[in-house]
Amino acid sequence: MHRGLGSVRHGVAQVFLSLALSLPALAQQQPIPSAPPAAAPAEDGQWTMPAKNYASTRYSELDQINTENVKNLQVAFTFSTGVNKGQESAPLVVGSTMYVLSPYPNILYALDLTQPGAPLKWQYNPKPDSAAQGVACCDVVNRGPTFANGKIFFTTLDAHVVAVNADTGEEVWKTKLGDINKGETMTMAPLVVKDKVIVGISGGEYGVRGWIQALDANSGQSVWKAYSTGPDQDVKIGPNFKPFYDSDKGKDLGISTWPPNAWEQGGGTVWGWISYDPELNLIYHGTANPGPWNANQRPGDNKWTAGIFARDADTGEARWFYQTAPHDLHDWDNINELILLDLEWEGKPRKVLVHPGRTGFVYVIDRTTGEVLSAKPFHALTAVTGVDLKTGRIQYNADKEPVNNRVVRDICPTASGGKDWNPSAFSHKTGILYIPHSNLCMDWESVEPNYIAGTPYVGAEVRMFPGPGGHMGEFSAWDIRAGKELWTINERFPLWSGAVATAGDVVFYGTMDGWFKAVHARTGEVLWQFKTDSGIIGQPTTYRGPDGKQYVAILSGVGGWAGAIVSGDLDPRDGTAALGFVNAMRELKNVTTKGGTLYVFKLP
């Protein structure tokens, strides 16, 4: 159901259509935020990195497909990845070639867009170690490749980074960065900044120690590496580190905010999105949950997990840090997208970072200092009551704090957060942020785990279930300055796909029951939808083909953490399976099956 501005959030579903239709006029009266010019260059019709640009807006200036003609979209071609696992990747387009990366075994395909049906030009198989599948937390997914300087860069599940010649498919270099015997894997999309390929490690549910690392794009050799826990030297905290909040100031907090030696298995992995401001020469990245999930075993703030770092792109030196969830209680990894915008805030120009977080808040943060300007909830909340802007600290609800060997009920949001990794999109035309997210709550029981390298290190039994209203997914339009929802589309299942906004006033996203949808960017009206052969958890992209026409691409193939019940053939009777997601997703098996197909659409 479409829900207008006047409806009660998570309350009775009621549509005020006239008010919803007035939103375009309201939005146009306000100054439209813009991305830094260098971080969001002029539209060239390509899609060379998953986030579209360094500012991570996922916005295209292409407008051939618009609100009037999108209803006429039809399939241009399809392509099978040959892998029926979770397809989280973003198809890239560079010149007249499309690049598609599969989940494990991480095969890279190049398709010729100049020919009818886009035939295969070449494929590259990195042949990752099959044992990596056994230590992948949440399906054998990969979030996509990136292109720079004639090469395609991507990660493999067995913790390698690969560079491939974009024209020929020949391997240029391949570098091993992790040890699957310790539970270290890689699933993230790299970011290339100047001559460096920046990547991070996965494995937070296995007691690994998180890090981010820059490799030389020409050789694959390590240039710098920064850990998320441990002494300042390891975290690359030095004299230029100037966090905004007092709780982040002090020496070696990556040790002192943990029990003795616990930081060595402390998590804080870096498996999500990275943004870059060329004017400030700063990269921005999140850090994931501390380990184990059971917070009773790790008293303290557990620096530097569950937060956001700003780092010098050349050296990795930390400039500031903000912790969204000190002493994280509920697995609220802070790895979601970090959208860079230049806007007027309370009468002053600000360089901000907009972050729809796992905690259920949309944060607006000054990206030069780390000061939180706003933190407004976009998800039903019971576990927290707000964020204190003076201290920056989230306010936990004591009644929902986990206790060993006792079930704490009705915690909202869940361990998967108000939203997970699946990225939002920001339209420079409407000035609106479009957020694909969940509507889930959970019951949680903490238990005591023991650390054994290469085995799960969690310490919690979780059961998720639908949030208020009974639906589990929402696609929301968000007013950044006002800190409020403009309209929301309710979906039966959690939204696990990304979003793309276009200058044609059309926004695209997919659902876990297999629908690829186009909605009106200003009103939320569903203008077109197409049923694919499997649930969608991928990232849509749009591009201008060699024929001058606009196309839209999406990978279909259910899986990931939310869809593991299907992709992993899990028993629906075990509600704690997939770290609690099976309890909420039992019906998914009845509406979709495994898949692995690329769909590309165009106008007639």
Which stretches of residues belong to each language-model region?
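Bacterial N-terminal signal peptides
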Residues: 11-25
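N-terminal cofactor/phosphate-binding cores enriched in small/glycine residues
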Residues: 60-178, 502
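Repeat-solenoid scaffold signature
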Residues: 185-221, 328-390, 400-412, 416-421, ...
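N-terminal pre-domain segments of enzymes
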Residues: 28-63, 588-592
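Extracytoplasmic beta-rich repeat domains
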Residues: 79-90, 123-146, 174-189, 227-273, ...
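Short, conserved, GDST-rich strand-edge loop motifs in beta-rich repeat architectures
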Residues: 199-211, 257-259, 285-302, 408, ...
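Beta-propeller blade signature
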Residues: 169, 210-221, 301-316, 366-370, ...
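Repeat-blade elements of multi-bladed beta-propeller folds
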Residues: 47-51, 86-107, 134-161, 185-206, ...
